[in-house]
Amino acid sequence: MPKAIKARFLSVLVLSILLTGIPRVEANNHVLFPSSEKVIYFLDVSNSSDSVNLWRLLRNSLLERLDDAMGAPNRKGLTPKKPTDLSISVINSNSSSSSPIEIISIKDTERLWAFMINKVGGGKPTEARMRDIYKDFFGGTGVYRELLGKYIQDETVIAPSTSECEKSAEENLKQGLFMDNVTPSIRTQATKEVCAIIQKLSSGLKKADATFLSGPKCKGACSDVVGGVKVAAAVARDLSKDKNAKLCIAIASDMLNNSPQITKTGAWHTLNAIKNSPTLLDAEKSGQTVASQSGILFSSKVKIRVEVIGQGGGPDFNPELTSKLDAYWSGFWKAVGLQNRQQSSLDQACSGGNN
């Protein structure tokens, strides 16, 4: 082999070895939190539901968990904790046109942790270094908790500007156990990563507050439950790109599908359909018919569970109607490829499955 070619070959080989040794950010979902689960809540804003109190309950539950919402992966120096994931959407007269409000996301959490481990910690941080990095970000005086206290409180949510948030984050990180010694560029990037989450969190909460607390209550035929399920199916399709993806769908509604787009006769008007069903089997077939006509089918690549809060209820629901309503939705869920269970409390829905 000529000397020039040999020298070029050796240079390429050395460069390849060096590049291979550079730590890479673990950007793929389900790497740092392999059993994480995406959660989406649907709140019915019709007169039959109390969406204001439902959102207050869900909001309070989320605020109580915010300090530990970023969780912790299984790494030396850390106590593993599952992160919080929460999106919220509305059931109204045309639910399928409503986009979910993503308040806090597993993907955002994993991106921040990947940055902390790979960029700040150098790829394989020691146990002591990992503990210090954790304290700088999520400890009692860490940057994440300080920004939470400044911008997100029980009743008041402030959406900070990028420059304002990053300035506060920079001042905090300069006092850190480890972050005070990193390069200015890494500290600057850290402020951007943390503030992106804080801004998304505050923006999501403000949007949800506007939708469920101050927004007008829907009157008339405005429980497009099937449209909400279509939105959930679209979320599942997006998740199917990720290996081992999980999704929990929590629906707070009386589950009496009714919207301006449907007639009062036929299977789509749930209340009339079950009242006109002689048997439980007939009610189940009505639910299957709606599922078939809706064109909804959930991806088998995603592990999905459905939890319903408040199905039926009210003075008009005797035991026979309740059984027929259960049969109706049992037929529907089976036809779209899912099973469901009923929950008594919204704040307990979709809990315990993200382990």
Q: Language-model segments: which ranges?
A:
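Bacterial N-terminal signal peptides
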Residues: 11-20
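Acidic, polar low-complexity linker/tail segments
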Residues: 21-56, 109, 117, 353-355
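Acidic/histidine-rich, surface-exposed loop or edge segments in extracytoplasmic proteins
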Residues: 35-52, 205-216, 307-312
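DG-centered beta-turn motif at the end of beta-strands
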Residues: 42-46, 247-258
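…and closely analogous acidic/polar surface helices at protein-protein or active-site interfaces
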Residues: 47-85, 105, 111-116, 121, ...
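VWA/integrin I-like adhesion module and closely mimicked acidic/polar interface patches used
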Residues: 53, 256-321
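Acidic helix-start/capping segments at beta-turn-to-alpha-helix junctions
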Residues: 78-110, 351-354
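Von Willebrand factor
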Residues: 120-244, 257
